[in-house]
Amino acid sequence: QEWADVDFWGNELTLHASEHKLDNERHDVDMGNVSVPHFGVHLSRKDFDALKQRLKDNGTKYYDEPYLRFKGTKYEQETFFVKDPNENILEIKTLTANPD
């Protein structure tokens, strides 16, 4: 199969297989730099913590360890990056100051 649809926390993410790989680079942001390209998803604190525990239980290594962004503001969020089995980079984050 050359493609797959994945339930990406209530959103459809369609993945296509390709021989061509994009080069990763890092772009400067507020707290350092992030890998580009990447996919991102905002999770509730409950789902975020459950996913972190699942990754830990499975021995998954972080691409970028969890850290806080916008610390002390209403936009404060915890975020981390992982690679999927096809080397796609995923950013997972949750708001910490005002989860609603």
Indicate where each model-derived feature is located.
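Core segments of cupin and vicinal oxygen chelate
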Residues: 1-20
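Conserved beta-strand edge residues that scaffold enzyme active sites
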Residues: 1-3, 69-70, 96
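Short connector loops at helix/strand junctions that flank enzyme active sites
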Residues: 8-10, 31-36
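A short acidic/small-residue loop/turn micro-motif
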Residues: 21, 96-99
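Short beta-strand/turn micro-motifs at beta-sheet edges
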Residues: 24-29
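Vicinal oxygen chelate
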Residues: 34, 39-85
